[in-house]
Amino acid sequence: MNYKPRTKVIAGNWKMYKCKDEALEFIQKVSLQVPDQTQVQTLIFPQLTLLDSLAQLQGTNLQVGAQNMFYESEGAFTGEVSPQNLLSLGVKHVLLGHSERRTFFGETDQTVNLKLLSALKHKLVPTVCVGESLLTKENNQTQVFLDQQLTNIFAGVPEEALQNIIIAYEPVWAIGTGKSATPQDANKVIEQIRDKVTALYSSQASCAMRIIYGGSVSVANIKTILEQPAIDGILAGKASLQTEDFLFFAQIASKQALASTKDIFQKNDCPFCC
């Protein structure tokens, strides 16, 4: 099986912010300035109503994804959006299992698993969110919780699909709170996530899979976060709403990607070794 090197990911989850005009202005500005996708993959997840307009403007250096989708291709599911509908708009990425979907809309690991399998079936690229609550963290059960969450979510997912899946580690206690795991702590947890994927599949497959961090990412901490060896990028929330901040994230990632590439060639290392 052939695996691609891990490209850094800078993703922005706009949640329920931005109307059409300001969203179009953002995409028009950013798409002209973000780094080449061979260095950094840049993604924006806007509201559903913006997908049609924004997907038409996305370029090779900036892509647009949906914040959610249903697991059935069509049917009487009022208020939902199908994977086929996303594809018809030119959307190739989808965010699954965000903590706010779980908290406010009752999504479970089993629901996310069905959506993940459906996304893969329809050739969409899923970014799958996992993360623990504050109580779980305080009880020192983070690894146990995440191990079970990953087992549930990846049930039935074939190994060859892993390099087309992004995992976003977003500790629930750090979402929209201003609190953030230290970069070193986030790095440790992401190493544990990769170890679990290795246990479920293989070390080669897990090392080819990108795992990013989300949780109160900011201009102040982005550089330190991306310097962590296990972290392949970020999923930013409100911090991704400002053009300058999003471009700053992408530029930092690009600089680090270029530096890492130089080190790889000097050391003759495997480009996706953990």
From Swiss-Prot:
Its main location: cytoplasm. GO terms for molecular function: triose-phosphate isomerase activity. SUPFAM superfamilies: Triosephosphate isomerase (TIM). GO terms for cellular component: cytosol. It comes from the Bacteria. Its EC number is 5.3.1.1. Keywords: Cytoplasm, Gluconeogenesis, Glycolysis, Isomerase. One of its GO terms (biological process) is glycolytic process. PROSITE patterns: TIM_1, TIM_2. The active site is at residues 98, 170. Pathway: Carbohydrate biosynthesis; gluconeogenesis; Carbohydrate degradation; glycolysis; D-glyceraldehyde 3-phosphate from glycerone phosphate: step 1/1. Substrate binds at residues 13-15, 176, 216. It is found in: Cytoplasm. InterPro entries: Aldolase_TIM, TIM_sf, TrioseP_Isoase_bac/euk, Triosephosphate_isomerase, Triosephosphate_isomerase_AS. Belongs to the triosephosphate isomerase family. Involved in the gluconeogenesis. Catalyzes stereospecifically the conversion of dihydroxyacetone phosphate (DHAP) to D-glyceraldehyde-3-phosphate (G3P). This is Triosephosphate isomerase. It comes from Onion yellows phytoplasma (strain OY-M).
